[in-house]
Curated annotation (Swiss-Prot):
GO terms for biological process: rRNA base methylation. It catalyses: cytidine(1407) in 16S rRNA + S-adenosyl-L-methionine = 5-methylcytidine(1407) in 16S rRNA + S-adenosyl-L-homocysteine + H(+). The gene is rsmF. This is Ribosomal RNA small subunit methyltransferase F. The active site is at residue 247. Pfam families: Methyltr_RsmB-F (PF01189), Methyltr_RsmF_N (PF17125), Methyltranf_PUA (PF13636), YebU_pre-PUA_dom (PF21150). S-adenosyl-L-methionine binds at residues 125-131, 149, 176, 194. Its main location: cytoplasm.
Amino acid sequence: MAENTVYFPEAFLAQMRAAMPAHLSFDDFIAACQRPLRRSIRVNTLKISVDDFLSLVAPYGWQLAPVPWCAEGFWIEREDDDALPLGSTAEHLSGLFYIQEASSMLPVAALFADNRQPERVMDVAAAPGSKTTQIAARMGNAGGILANEFSASRVKVLHANISRCGISNVALTHFDGRVFGAALPETFDAILLDAPCSGEGVVRKDADALKNWSPESNLDIAATQRELIDSAFHALRPGGTLVYSTCTLNREENQSVIEWLLSRYPQAVEILPLGELFPGAADALTAEGFLHVFPQIYDCEGFFVARLRKTAAIDPLPAPGYKVGKFPFTPLKDREAAAVTAAARAVGLEWDAGHTLWQRDKELWLFPLALEPLFGKVRFSRIGVRLAELHNKGYRWQHEAVIAFAAPQRAFELSQEEAEEWYRGRDVYPQTAPGQDETIVTFQGVPLGLAKRVGSRLKNSYPRELVRDGKLFAGKV
């Protein structure tokens, strides 16, 4: 691969020379920044185990190298990348893996370093969804995740990725992350703040990332980061874990932000060192116990990760002055919920006791039980999964519910040729059609959607916005 021509401001180079640890070479840093970034993926264990995924793609000739800090993560090299983009493969479309930069898998690895299962988690800056989906997989779709995104244009992408991955325990909000400390004090067991930053670590992906860089802008960004981490710390319950991360390399946006939090709450902040997070972590370990990943260490993007514990309650912030408004959903009564559950099971949709049924007009939704205490405290963009729409003849089951709640053992498995037709939005004509009028169709054991039987034809219900043309399969038909 050809090297990048990266733009480096002189002041940035001087800053990096001063910051570079003695055991690292500045020349190696420059050389690493000029190399194209290695592509990486994370297996979505909500849909497939790592071993089964490796067996599935073995015939494709993909070269997969493990990411040391994420058991589900792999660097990937493919000979057929030009003919079939990675994001257009059937395995990606069905949510079997997420295209995620390797270093961005680090914060979630740190969040779950003690192997505890938090009940309630917040991802403060969640789009496009790589870390939210990674958190959901680590939680096994249990508990609840509040995924917030400040940028309105990115909320839609966040939801699309959550839906593709079959995630059902997430609620989306669209706020400035600085509101949560006051709105939801001491609410979450774990919080990830992957803070907006100057992006000094991403030059391998964007050669012009530093075009607008300046020391002054770093200080301005750090001021916002301090406000964000203060809010997040207020929203964290005592005993909870906060992971702060950035994809930048300067001290002002990294160590100094943590030092500021320590000085503000000296009796309530404990640093949890990350030197044992994975074999080789010591190569990026700072004296404080943080991970400061320069790109030459692991041949990835530059990154910073700190893990903290809140050891005591702190004085609350003033209550927010805004009005949330009336919550637009009502919970289904027991008899109604039983009828919906039975009808869903008849078509192969099943869920556990961690989800509850709610209704808004003619819409039926499944909400994560763990997030119900938050209802009425903040305004949500979306909660859980839309299950169905009511109509005169019963229920119109929604695509996202099929992806999240299908029981594959009760589904109709398509051949590769039939699956390709399905992804193209076309009806399928199997040799032997299923007996029931509505059936979940799968490929590789993974749900693709809900089909209606019309004679010998399976009528396609794949959402129009998801329909794909072109090559979809890496293996031979």
